[in-house]
Amino acid sequence: MSAIMTKVLIIGAGHAGGSAAALLRQYGFEGEIVLAGQESAPPYQRPPLSKAWLKGEAGLEDLLLRPGFLYECEQAMGRIAAACRGITAVVGWPQAAGAVVYNAASVLRDGAVADTYRKRELPNYAVFDERRYFGVDPDGGPCVFDVAGVPVGLVICEDLWFPEPMADTARAGAELVVVPNASPYERGKHAQRDALLAERTRATGAAIAYLNVVGGQDALVFDGASVVADGDGTVHPAAVAFAEQWLVVEYAPDERRFMPRVWVDDGDESVDALAWRAVTRGVQDYCRKNGFGKVWVGLSGGIDSALVLAIAVDALGADNVTAVRLPSRYTSGLSNDLAAEQCAALGVKLETVAIEPAFEGFLAALGPMFAGTTPDLTEENLQSRCRGALLMALSNKFGGLLLTTGNKSEYAVGYATIYGDMCGGYAPLKDLYKTEVFALSKWRNTVGGAPVIPPAVIARPPSAELRENQKDQDSLPPYDVLDAILLRHVDQEQSREEIVAAGFAADTVDKVLKLVRVNEWKRHQAAPGPKVSRRAFGRERRYPITNGYRG
C-alpha cells in the first residue's frame, strides 16, 4: 500500500466494491474509504434472482409505485447507514417524501445519512420513464461533502448531460464530483460519454469519477466501463466494459487529477467486439438472474441459429447449452451436416427431433377443412409452429430457457413466425439486423483460434427451408438494401419521402414500410432481447397496433 495514499475511492458499491473495502481494511489501510455506487441496497440485501434491487433508471418500473417497496428501500438505507463506520459511502435509492418519490443518492458516514442529493434532470425518452415515477425537488440544491479535506460533489446520471447541475456543484465548492449512473449500452456510447466528461471538466475545473452499473436487466445491458476525468479534461479508462470489478484509484487533490496506478486496456473496442460483449452479457445475466442454468437452441444450419449458439456457449459454457436439429422434408443434407459440424466444434450436445410426424398430424387433422385448397404460407408456418411446440416441450420437460433466433430485420418485416420460431424466452439477435448478424459472425470467427461458426454457414444464401428451393430473397429485397431502408425508417425515423429521396426505389420502400407497419402486432408479443442500437424494438419504439398513419 502506497505510503502517500490517505484516501481511496472505490467505484461501485456492489459485492465487488464491498469486498474491496473489506480487503483494504484487512491489509491495514487506515485512510478514508469512499464507496460510491448506484446500487440501492448493500450486497447482502440483493438476492441473486431479484431484479428489484438492480438500481437502474429503467429497471424498477412500477415497483416504484408500490408503498411497500419504497418502505423496504428506506429500511435498507437505514441498515446500510448504520453499517457505514470508518468509510464514506454514496448509495442511490428511491426516496419517498410524502406523495413524491425522488431519484436520490445519499452520503452515508458515521452510522448515519450525512446528506442526500435529489436528481434534477429526469429523462423521459427512449427507454426512460423517470417522470412517471419521480419528482424534482424545487428546493433542491448542490450536494458537497468533505472527504479527508477534499470537497466532493454529487450529481446523478442525466444531470451530467446538462451543464447547470455540474456547474452549480462546482460553484458550491466541489473539486471532485462523483457521478453514479445506470446508463445502458448502445453503439457509440463510450465516445459520447468521454467527450461529455471532457467538456464538463474543462468547463468547471472539477475532476469527475463516473461510475456505471454493470449487467443485463431484461432488454437493457449496462456496460459499466467506469472512467475518471482530471480537472483539465483528460479522461482515463478505469474499468473494463461489461465486467464487474472492484476499482481503486488515487486522486491528487492539489492538481485535481487521478494518478495512473493502472489504467485499463480494454482490448478490442470495435463495433462488433462491443456488440458481442453486450449480447453475451445480456444472455448471461438474463439466465442467471431469472434462475436458468441451461438453455436450448433450435439449430437449423443457418446463420441466425448458428450465431445464437455461439453466443450461448460464450455466455454460459458448452455444458449448459443443448442444440436441437428439427429437420423436415425440406431440410437439406447440408443444413443437417453444418449443424452437426458446429456442435462438434463447440463441444455442444446435439439432439435431433424430426418434425415430420407432428406436421403430418396437423395436415391430417386439418385435411377435411383444407380440402380443395392450394398449399401456401399456412403450411410453411405450420412447420415452424411444429418446431416451436417441440422445443418448448423440451424446455418444459427438462428445464432450461429456450433462446429464439430471430433478428431485427425479421422482426421488422414480419419474417418470423408467431408461435413458431418466435417461441422462447429471450432473443439474443433481436436488435441486430441481418447484415449485422453476418458481420458479427465473421468477426467472432476471427477471435480465439478455430472458427466457431462453419464458414459454409456464412457463405450460403439464407433460407427458411419451408418449401422446395426457397431463398429469403425470393420475397424480400437483398438484405443490404432492406437493412439500409430499415435503419433509416426504424432507427432514424425517416419518412417514406426522405428514404426515396436518398435513392431507394419507391416501390421497394413502400413494400418494406408496409411490412413494418402491418407486423407491429407480432413485435408486441416478441420475447425481450438485448439492446445494442440507438433505437431497439420495444420500449424505445412504442407504436400502436391499430394505426391508420401511412407516413
Which stretches of residues belong to each language-model region?
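Beta1-alpha1 glycine-rich phosphate/pyrophosphate-binding loop at the start
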Residues: 4-63
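ATP/NTP-dependent adenylation/nucleotidyl-transfer catalytic domains that generate, transfer
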Residues: 66-68, 148, 205, 231, ...
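Conserved G/P- and acidic residue-centered "switch" motifs that form tight phosphate/ATP-binding loops
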Residues: 14, 159, 302
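Residues at the starts of beta-strands that form the adenosine-phosphate
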Residues: 7, 30-32, 175, 320-322, ...
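Enzyme catalytic cores with a strong preference for nitrogen-chemistry domains
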Residues: 61-298, 309-318, 325, 350
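Short, surface-exposed alpha-helical segments at coil->helix boundaries
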Residues: 47, 60-63, 74-77, 194, ...
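Short beta-strand "acidic-cap" motif of Rossmann-like dinucleotide-binding folds
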Residues: 30-37, 116, 323-325, 352
